[in-house]
A protein has these predicted regions:
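An N-terminal domain-cap segment
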Residues: 30-78
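Short, solvent-exposed loop/turn segments at secondary-structure junctions
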Residues: 87-91, 223-227, 268-273, 298
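C-terminal capping/extension of enzyme domains
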Residues: 1-38, 161, 168-179, 230-257, ...
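Long, low-complexity, polar/charged, intrinsically disordered or flexibly structured peripheral segments
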Residues: 25-49, 175-176, 183-219
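Adenosine ribonucleotide-centric catalytic and binding domains
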Residues: 58-207, 281-298
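Conserved beta-strand->loop/alpha-helix structural units within folded catalytic cores of enzymes
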Residues: 60-64, 252-261
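A structural signal for short, well-ordered beta-strand segments and their strand-loop junctions
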Residues: 81-85, 212-213, 217-221, 262-267
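Charged, often glycine-rich, active-site loop that binds/positions anionic groups
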Residues: 45-62, 212-245
Length: 329
């Protein structure tokens, strides 16, 4: 079995050179005029299949948002439990978290070295309930953390960024104005409205925010770009399957299977990709480590892991998840 570090060093498509170029895009945008081109964070080798995807799905409300940094990794891949998801979501709140753009009007709320206008302060008061909750330094800090997350650097502590306080920028009572951002989505997915015992992590003693989450759980998106909705059938697209990102995804997931990680599969489309990738026989032999979530409820609850669509032995699998998450194994 290949070492995880070797897989990352040889396969991570988010190279230092690429990330430096993206960081410069962000710096230029932060310092730019009130109206200036948005950053464009697409991989060069993705152009062909991106064009195909956008032609088929953009007008159906499933277009990709390249102004936001790809966000496929959360937590530490050495964690005992992995969860495979579809792709990073999108709302106008994410544009604020990534770029400092107003979730309501789309104009700049945060830029380097300048005061906000009365119009911008009006939007801020309406959306945040007061003036701007942070400044350009806080925006740059979030951007830096998102860039660092793409490196998958195992020599530094790996956090679950979207439940970190730095990413909780919007009062929850105001999310109806512009949709849920990544922070609220992940908190609801992992913990619900609070630390309910009906959710897997709280039942293991993991509360929010807790550094143990990044050490115990690794989340991996099957597709790296943001969209409000995503057509999962595109995971079968031949051009996408030859992309650098998907090849890296396969190497990572292959390592997780071989090393005996517990793997939670979020969607049936991902389960089919996983089964095709490792083969039906190997998939069957690893059923003790793979559990599919019921598709009805989007939250990481024990009930969703033991839903009527899951296997009869799902409660046994959930208990094994709880053992490794709580460190009892």
């Amino acid at each position: 079995m290949r070492e995880l570090q070797s897989i990352i060093d040889g396969g991570n498509p988010y190279t230092e050179q690429l990330l430096n170029a993206w960081r410069k895009q962000l710096d230029d945008f932060n310092a730019g005029a009130a109206v200036c081109p948005l950053p464009n964070f697409r991989m060069d080798d993705d152009e062909e299949w991106i064009d195909e995807y956008q032609r088929k799905y953009e007008k159906k409300g499933r277009g990709l948002h390249f102004e936001l940094l790809p966000d496929p990794f959360r937590g530490d891949p050495r964690a005992p439990v992995w969860i495979l998801l579809l792709n990073p979501g999108y709302s106008e709140v994410d544009r604020y978290d990534h770029l400092g753009l107003c979730p309501l009007c789309g104009e700049r709320l945060v830029r380097a070295d300048r005061k906000t206008t009365s119009h911008e302060n009006g939007c801020a008061a309406r959306f945040f309930g007061s003036g701007l909750p942070d400044a350009s330094a806080a925006l740059k800090s979030r951007q830096d953390m998102l860039i660092e997350e793409l490196k998958l650097d195992l020599s530094t502590p790996r956090k679950f960024l979207w439940i970190e306080p730095d990413f909780h920028t919007v009062p929850e009572e105001n999310v109806t104005l512009a949709g849920k951002g990544g922070s609220l989505w992940w908190k609801e997915f992992l913990f619900g409205d609070g630390d309910s015992d009906g959710y897997l992590l709280p039942s293991c003693g993991i509360k929010q925010p807790d550094i143990a989450i990044g050490k115990r759980l690794f989340a991996l998106e099957s597709f790296p770009y943001h969209s409000k909705k995503f057509d999962s059938s595109f995971l079968q697209n031949e051009k996408f399957c030859h992309s650098d990102y998907f090849k890296f995804w396969c190497f990572l997931v292959g390592w997780a299977v071989e090393s005996g990680r517990k793997i939670i599969v979020r969607y049936e489309a991902i389960r089919k990709v996983l089964e095709r990738m490792i083969g039906k026989s190997a998939y069957a032999n690893n059923k003790g480590n793979i559990i599919s979530m019921a598709s009805i409820n989007p939250s990481l609850t024990i009930g969703n892991l033991c839903g009527k669509n899951c296997r009869a032995n799902s409660m046994e699998l959930v208990e094994s998840l709880r053992e490794v998450l709580s460190g009892r194994e």
